[in-house]
From Swiss-Prot:
PROSITE patterns: FLAVODOXIN_LIKE. Fe cation 1 binds at residues 92, 94, 159, 178. Its cofactor is Fe cation. SMART domains: Flavin_Reduct, Lactamase_B. This is Putative diflavin flavoprotein A 3. Fe cation 2 binds at residues 96, 178, 236. Keywords: Electron transport, Iron, Metal-binding, Oxidoreductase, Transport. Residues 265-409 form the Flavodoxin-like domain. Its EC number is 1.-.-.-. It comes from Nostoc sp. (strain PCC 7120 / SAG 25.82 / UTEX 2576).
Length: 574
């Protein structure tokens, strides 16, 4: 049975569904959520999933976002008297899943909270009231009766340090919270249409799970010790039932590829201080676009200094988030270990975390410079609440760092192509275009020549977009942009401008005549023609995305003029 409330003005709804024996999903549907965490440019909203399991005793797995407080508790109390709930299982303490824990404990103070040791510690700081607790370790079990025996899997860093999975042996359902989820809002409970959801599934992995690929593989190994998993009840998006093996297999493949990366960058910061998590995640997103592996270390957690020393030694680059000035001795010890383990061949980037009490950034930056490290991007200084542009700046800074540490590899790859084949590929020619895009307050642009019409009905074309281009994150499925066509004999000024290497966060359109298209993207005043377009699909082509888009509007400024053509002599670069 599925029940769905009427959609409110803000398009926040609650859906309940019986998903297995004695098991009800309570899904908080946020239809218009256009951003989540950092770089999720959502087109399809998101959901926050909670689950009620009734054995001889009753357990609730996770709660919801605080914005759903009234809707969630109206729904929960319609299903059960909260005082009848025996256990609240906390998958992790991120506010979008635990935002209503304090309210629930006030309604039902006899509930026993079940979670990892770290989760219980975090929760004490969130609820500020005594509560019953049960700390679980990997392999521990909780018997609700009537066959509902829960087994717990410790899965740290997916994507919070306190994460656990919970497996119900009776229904063979694995509750994973963020892992295997996606930001996709639909009243279709399960993964029935894989083709529709897989772009969001992949993008979610890239943003949140990819930077913790080793932790993903560890969790998958522990999952392998469980009996067959029939369903994965995720914290976001549709539940996995029809494609469990396929989608867990993709996680394994993607994570194995990440850990095989020839180069890696260490990202070090104090989680849950200021905006550190969000800023670090944006930088990580930029790094991973370059194909570089990432090792994330929370300096606020227990850190083995020998392991830290070894990690720093094998990294080709480092990112440091400024810690609180009054930070614990363990954090200062970890920073001293990092400084004592670096070498002059490495690159470094530093960002303020905006916690209001950051250590000064310049003394630490000077120490790294004095040790001979290259500064890969200008220090990121946070003087006010970060905006979309701040996070875009962070992403671009991460990409700059990733490109710096892979520069030798890129040159080697260019030289590896046979001379004859290189020259033959160079005879493939294309027009010259500028892609412009704008989403919210963030805008970007890219010079392109790999553009080809792909269909008549609908009118569509393909563009090859390198994965490490700044504009790539603005060209997800559903995003809109403008294709500006450059004119033969009049393309040099625009081409020279957009070929410049822009600093992270720089305005690509400064000094360029533009006007806004209906979709908000800039139309270049000196372009020969323009087309307004929407991304329909993307195909992974190694170091590029082949982006197929449809065209719904366009104009030509000079009917007799021709498109500028880019003639190459070799095929190993643009």
């Amino acid at each position: 049975m599925v029940a769905l409330t009427e959609k409110t003005e803000k398009r926040l709804t609650i859906q309940t569904a019986d998903i297995a024996q004695d098991t009800t999903a309570i899904r908080s549907l946020d239809w218009e959520r256009d951003r989540f965490d950092i770089e999720f440019g959502l087109q399809n909203g998101t959901t926050y999933n909670s689950f009620l399991i009734r054995g001889e005793q009753i357990a609730l797995v996770d709660t919801s976002h605080e914005k759903f407080r009234q809707l969630y508790f109206d729904t929960l109390t319609g299903l059960i008297n909260p005082t009848e709930i025996n256990y609240l299982i906390i998958s992790h303490t991120e506010p979008d899943h635990s935002g209503l824990v304090k309210d629930l404990l006030q309604m039902a103070p006899e509930i026993t909270v079940v979670g990892s040791k770290v989760a219980i510690q975090f929760l004490e700081d969130l609820v500020h009231q005594p509560f019953k607790r049960k700390i679980v370790k990997n392999g521990d079990r909780l018997d609700l009766g009537n066959g509902h025996e829960f087994e717990f899997v410790i899965a740290p860093n997916l994507h919070w340090p306190d994460t656990i999975f919970s497996f119900d042996h009776k229904t063979q359902t694995l509750y994973t919270c963020d892992a295997f989820g996606m930001h996709y809002c639909s009243d279709i409970v399960f993964d029935e249409d894989l083709k529709t959801i897989e772009p969001d599934f992949h993008y979610y992995y890239d943003c949140l799970m990819g930077p913790n690929a080793r932790s993903v593989l560890s969790a998958l190994k522990r999952m392998g010790e469980l009996p067959s998993v029939k369903m994965i009840a995720t914290g976001h998006g549709p539940l996995l039932y029809h494609n469990v093996e396929e989608l867990t297999g993709r996680y394994r493949t993607w994570s194995q590829n990440q850990t095989k990366a020839e180069t890696s960058i260490g990202v070090f910061y104090v989680s849950e201080y200021g905006y550190s998590d969000r800023l670090a995640q944006a930088i990580i997103n930029g790094i991973t676009k370059t194909g570089v592996g990432v090792d994330v270390v929370d300096l606020g957690a227990a850190v083995d200094l020998q392991e830290l020393r070894e990690l720093v030694g094998r990294c080709t680059g480092l990112v440091i988030g400024m810690s609180p000035a009054a930070s614990a001795a363990s954090i200062q010890g970890a920073l001293s270990t990092i400084l004592g383990s670096v070498n002059e061949k490495q690159a470094v980037g530093i960002f303020e975390t905006g916690g209001g009490d950051d250590e000064p950034i310049d003394p630490l930056l000077s120490k790294f410079r004095n040790l001979g490290l290259t500064t890969a991007f200008p220090a990121i200084r946070i003087k006010q609440t970060p905006t979309e542009n701040t996070y875009k700046l962070c992403e671009e800074a991460g990409t700059d760092l990733g490109q710096w540490v892979t520069r030798d590899r890129s040159i080697k790859a260019m030289k590896s192509l046979g001379a004859d084949l290189d020259k033959a590929l160079g005879r493939l020619s294309g027009g010259l275009y500028i892609i412009t895009a704008k989403k919210g307050d963030v805008s970007s642009a890219m010079l392109a020549s790999w553009v080809n019409q792909a269909s008549f009905k609908p009118l569509g074309f393909s563009i090859a977009v390198a994965k490490d281009r700044a504009i790539e994150s603005l060209m997800q499925v559903g995003d809109r942009f403008v294709l500006n066509v450059l004119e033969e004999g009049n393309y040099q000024p625009l081409m020279r401008h957009f070929l410049k290497r822009f600093a992270p966060g720089a305005d690509r359109f400064e000094g360029v005549k533009t006007q806004p298209a209906e979709n908000g993207a800039p139309i270049l005043g000196d372009a020969l023609a323009y087309m307004e377009c929407e991304v329909v699909s993307r195909m992974d082509c190694g170091d590029h995305w082949a982006v197929y888009s449809t065209v719904y509007a366009g104009r030509v400024s000079k009917s007799e003029a021709l498109t500028a053509v880019h003639h190459r002599k070799v095929g190993n670069h643009y």
